[in-house]
Amino acid sequence: MNLSQFEQFDLSPELLKALEKKGYSRPTAIQMEAIPAAMEESDVLGSAPTGTGKTAAFLLPALQHLLDYPRRKPGPPRILVLTPTRELAMQVAEQAEELAQFTHLNIATITGGVAYQNHGDVFNTNQDLVVATPGRLLQYIKEENFDCRSVEMLIFDEADRMLQMGFGQDAEKIAAETRWRKQTLLFSATLEGELLVDFAERLLNDPVKVDAEPSRRERKKINQWYYHADSNEHKIKLLARFIETEEVTRGIVFIRRREDARELSETLRKRGIRSAYLEGEMAQTQRNNAIDKLKSGIVTVLVATDVAARGIDIDDVSHVMNFDLPYSADTYLHRIGRTARAGKKGTAVSFVEAHDYKLLGKIKRYTEEILKARILAGLEPRTKPPKDGEVKSVSKKQKARIKEKREEKKKTEAKKKVKLRHKDTKNIGKRRKPSNSNV
C-alpha cells in the first residue's frame, strides 16, 4: 500500500487536526505498514529504528479504535501500553495526549517512582488509554486495584529492552490477565534474538510482521558526512569546532563507552560549549534533569551512549554527532534517526579514525549512502585515510568459503592424473577388464 497522506488512513478529523498541529504531513515507513494492519484488527509485530515514528504507528490505530467504538459508560482502561521504563512511559503518554487533544479520551500513566496515592485517580475515574511499566502495574493487579477485563488492545513498546531488563515474566503475567483482549501489538528496535522471538510467538496470534527501515526519501532529509581524524585528541578538536561553527542548536553526541560520557562532556564545557551527559547507571532524576536541560536550551549538546539514549524522545534535534562510530549499521540508523523528524531537515556527522574505516565501509554498504569526507580549516588531518575511503573487509562467512575453496583445490591438485596407456585399454570388451586397476 502506497499511502502518501494521513488522510488516506481513514483517521478521524480530530486525529488529523492533531497531526496537522504537530506538523506531520507524510507517514513514515513504519506508519505506512503498521497503521493499516492495526486498523484491520490484526496482531502486529513491528520493528523500526528510533526516530521513525514508531510511537505514532501504534497510538493512532489505538486512538482510532476508541473513537470508532465509544464506550457506553465510564470504566477501566480499554487500551494498555507497556513500556520498560518510567521515562519512556511518560513520553508515550505525552504523545498520546497530543494526538488525542481534540477528543474527549482520557490518558493516564502507572509507573514506579510515584507515590501509591497518586495513582488513585487512575483506579477511580474513567480511563481510556493507560501507559504503564510492568513492575508497578503487576503490583496493582495483584492487589486487585487495576481491572484488566476491559482491555481490548495490549501494546508492547521496546519489547526487546523490556526483556533485557528482566521484565519478561511480569509482561507475560499481565498478558495473561488481559486474556479477553482482541488485539496485541508488539514493537521492538530489532526482531532478532531467540528470547524475543519466543516471547512474540507466545503472545501474538498470526501477526502481520512489519520490519520497516526509514525510506531513502526520509534519509535524504539528513545531510550526512564525516571528518577524518588523526587521533582521539584530534576528534575532540574537530567536534568542538564543528559545534561552534555549524550552528548546532540542539545536538546529541554519541559515544561507545559510558565511562567516557562525563569526561567528554566536561572537556566540551571547558571549551565553552554548554553540555550535559547521560550514562546508563544514572538516577532517574539525574537523567530527567539532563534531558530537560537540552529541551529547554540550557545546554546545546547531550553526550550519551546508545544504551543510555534508548527511549529518549527529543523533538527538533538539529545535529547528531557520532564521536565514536557504532559497531553496527542498524545502530547508525537509530542514531541519525533522532534528527530530521516530522518532515524537518537535519544533519548527521561522524568523526573517523583510521581504525574505524571498516565500520564506515559497513555503514556505506548497508545504507547505500554516499558519505563524503570534509575538512575543517585549520584542523586538517596529517594522516591519509585508507585508499578509497574504507578498508576492504571480509566477513567470517566469506573467509570460510575462501578457505574451503583452497582446501578443495589442494585436494584436486594432490590427485595424480592417471596416464591411460594403449596397452592397458586395447582389446577391452565385455569379458576383459583393464589390466590397470586405476583405470
Curated annotation (Swiss-Prot):
Its main location: cytoplasm. Its EC number is 3.6.4.13. Residues 381-393 have a biased composition (Basic and acidic residues). One of its GO terms (cellular component) is cytosol. InterPro entries: DEAD/DEAH_box_helicase_dom, DEAD_box_RNA_helicase, DEAD_helicase_SrmB, Helicase_ATP-bd, Helicase_C-like, P-loop_NTPase, RNA-helicase_DEAD-box_CS, RNA_helicase_DEAD_Q_motif. Gene3D superfamilies: P-loop containing nucleotide triphosphate hydrolases. It catalyses: ATP + H2O = ADP + phosphate + H(+). Residues 35-209 form the Helicase ATP-binding domain. ATP binds at residues 48-55. Keywords: ATP-binding, Cytoplasm, Helicase, Hydrolase, Nucleotide-binding, Ribosome biogenesis. GO terms for biological process: ribosomal large subunit assembly. Signal peptide: none annotated. Residues 381-439 are annotated as: Disordered. Belongs to the DEAD box helicase family. SrmB subfamily. Interacts with the 50S ribosomal subunit. This is ATP-dependent RNA helicase SrmB. The lineage of its organism: Bacteria, Pseudomonadati, Pseudomonadota, Gammaproteobacteria, Pasteurellales.
